[in-house]
């Protein structure tokens, strides 16, 4: 549909629409976000999910076409990566389509415990040395020889490195560095192919949902260091060490989020965080109050204090935890929900926090377009009242979502979401 507006005007119009929603004002209409993920494979009809890892140019063009055709207010296009960089290093805890999985299979994470229960002191005392000589060898097959390197503090001194250099000459260590070099080359190719995407989309009038990321400290430990089983046991067996680790990681997460300020665009600049293991089903309220919420809250407050808008993705069901979000700065964040009842979220947070979400991915997969339209109409009526609501799918789109249903979702705000 022709608007007669320039890309610059459309970009600012969309940014203002989002700003108004964040600030709990009434925009001209309800904003809508498209999370493309692996959906471009289905939309363009000639690619597989594996192409997001192995044909970066084609995947970027497919993603661009998807966004330009459907015309959301914001987009999130996080999917894929360099399959060759991954292949060079041999990840033990990750499988991706086209290598170990079918070309149209979703990527898979494999639970592990790279940080063992009795290694907290080692990790806390020197996370850099732990990462190099323990974490990387356990997570990447090609980097297993790094376990033979000398402790990093043992290299301090004007001439010490020379006397400690022998391990670096071992054939297996050299091979590990060669694998890392090859991965770096492949990642550089990937970066060159994808680094201009956000600016290209901006020049077409489309802002991104987020300009950077910052991880929740507890999730860093549970996702990447101790695994879910290990972290859940630590809440009983190693609570003090777990809390110390969360505190240490918090500063890194804040720094990661603040780096978003360097983004060329964004008014305001937005920082995303996917929250994996803080929902109702993972821990009790007491455990949430002790282990999860304190560092997450401080992360969000620290970023909003710097003028950033935090966009936490509350995965799972957060119905029992909604009141905690009232402790966050009013009108400064976007609470994106996956499976939380949005009517309840609106009732609790409506005058305090912009909420985002709503359309179940299952509906986009199997329902008729009319069913999707009816669902969106009702959702907009309930959650859009008074402003402070952004429509999107419950999760990132896969290649199983029906294109006509995704289009219906996006078009619904133009039909039913005008204030």
Please provide the spans of the model-predicted regions:
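Catalytic cores of TIM-barrel enzymes
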Residues: 1-419
């Amino acid at each position: 549909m022709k608007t007669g507006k320039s890309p610059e005007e459309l970009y600012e119009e969309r940014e203002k629409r989002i700003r108004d929603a964040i600030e709990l004002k009434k925009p001209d209409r309800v904003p809508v976000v498209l999370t493309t993920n692996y959906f471009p494979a289905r939309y363009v009809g000639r690619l597989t999910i594996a192409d997001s890892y192995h044909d970066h140019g084609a995947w970027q063009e497919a993603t661009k076409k998807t966004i330009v055709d459907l015309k959301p207010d914001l987009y999130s296009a996080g999917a894929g990566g360099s399959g060759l960089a991954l292949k060079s290093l041999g990840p033990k805890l990750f499988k991706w389509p086209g290598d170990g999985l079918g070309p149209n299979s979703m990527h898979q994470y494999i639970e592990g415990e790279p940080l063992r229960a009795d290694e907290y002191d080692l990790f806390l005392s020197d996370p850099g040395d732990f990462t190099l000589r323990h974490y990387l060898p356990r997570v990447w097959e090609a980097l297993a020889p790094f376990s033979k390197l000398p402790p990093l503090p043992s290299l301090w001194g004007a001439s010490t490195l020379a006397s400690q250099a022998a391990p670096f000459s071992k054939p297996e260590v050299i091979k590990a560095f060669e694998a890392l070099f090859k991965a770096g080359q492949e990642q550089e190719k990937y970066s060159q192919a994808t680094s201009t995407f956000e600016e290209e989309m901006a020049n077409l009038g489309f802002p991104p949902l987020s300009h950077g990321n910052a991880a929740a400290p507890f999730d860093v430990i549970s996702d990447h260091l101790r695994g879910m089983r290990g972290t859940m046991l630590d809440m009983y067996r190693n609570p003090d060490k777990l809390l110390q680790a969360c505190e240490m990681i918090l500063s890194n997460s804040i720094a990661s989020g603040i780096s978003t300020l360097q983004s060329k665009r964004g008014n305001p600049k937005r920082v995303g965080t996917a929250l994996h293991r803080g929902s109702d089903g993972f821990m009790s309220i007491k455990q949430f109050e002790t282990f999860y919420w304190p560092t997450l809250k401080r992360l969000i407050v620290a970023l909003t204090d710097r003028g950033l808008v935090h966009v936490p993705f509350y995965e799972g069901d957060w119905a029992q935890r909604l009141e905690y979000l009232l402790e966050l700065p009013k009108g400064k964040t976007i609470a994106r929900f996956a499976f939380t009842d949005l009517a309840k979220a609106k009732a609790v947070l409506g005058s305090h926090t912009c909420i985002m979400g709503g359309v179940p991915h299952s509906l986009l997969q199997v329902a008729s377009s009319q069913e999707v339209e009816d669902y969106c109409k009702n959702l907009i009526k309930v959650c859009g009242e008074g402003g402070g609501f952004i429509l999107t799918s419950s999760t990132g789109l896969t290649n199983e979502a029906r294109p006509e249903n995704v289009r219906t979702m996006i078009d619904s705000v133009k039909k039913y979401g005008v204030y």
